[in-house]
Amino acid sequence: MIPRDSYEIIDTLIKQGRSFAIWRIPGEDRLHFRMQSAGSPCLLYDIKDLNERSGFVIAPFQVTAERPIVLIQPDCFEIPSESDWDFSREKNEFPSNEIEIPSESEEKERYAYHFSLFTSPLLKGSQDKLVLSRSKTIRKDPSFSPGKAFFAAEERYIRSDVYLCHTPETGTWMGGTPEILLSGEKGDWQTVALAGTQSLRDGKLPKSWDHKNWREQQLVASYIRRQLSTLGITPEEKGPYSARAGEVSHLKSDFFFSLPNPEKLGDVLQLLHPTPAVCGLPKEEAYHFII
């Protein structure tokens, strides 16, 4: 059991440059922790290289020589206490370099420019879907605690996978998502098609969805069926149904299937990533347009 007042230990592990991850799976109350105390994380340059490997994976949207997949190979499975770890040894792993913080108007102008680039192929019909993400740079408050932020997030977003991870190669990442790329064990596996967004109605899930949201979710569902079929897999399906994520809801379908060779998970991940929910369709054209 990981006590939820361990945020100071998490903050210290980050300052010391440790390679670790802490996360909570949707619907669970138990926190998971993995740390590699000996050696450096493994760097991989192709998703298929995850075949026959295990550990905590930190992967970029685009895998390159400069941005490889980082695999934490844990040898520690519990958060260390102050008594069994040298918490007096702290260092500033990343020098506090000054970075330029763009103004709100500059950020808005930059987003509007990229928005126009993305809408053009959609209006022409050369792309069915493109996902434009937004980044925002803010100045970190000196009192900000990554550990405290993680514990607050995992308590609030009980239906999401909430995580915090750190390595010297990647820096610190924290996030939460209701979308499962792939989950399971041994021969039984699951993925989801999650798309469409609607606000809750008086705290309740909506009972109806418009054509735009239905079409958006079906694009993702059809993609998953096609990708799995290339491996000869015909999954069992549940949905689509309304699923809550924070203060909004999405349309969700579950896909259940068996894998004759679970050690080849890298092959399955390469087929599924990136899904239309985070990239677009057609997959290859959308992927290369974004990068």
Sequence positions of predicted segments:
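N-terminal accessory regions of nucleic-acid-interacting proteins
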Residues: 2-6, 14-17
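A broadly conserved detector of short glycine/acidic/proline-rich loop/turn motifs that flank catalytic sites
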Residues: 27, 61-62, 75-76, 186, ...
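Glycine-rich, flexible loop motifs
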Residues: 8-10, 115
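Non-catalytic accessory segments adjacent to catalytic cores
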Residues: 27-29, 35-139, 144, 231-233
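Short, surface-exposed recognition loops or helix-turn segments adjacent to catalytic cores
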Residues: 131-136, 166-167, 240-244
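A residue-level signal for conserved active-site and pocket-lining positions in enzyme catalytic cores
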Residues: 57, 125, 182, 222, ...
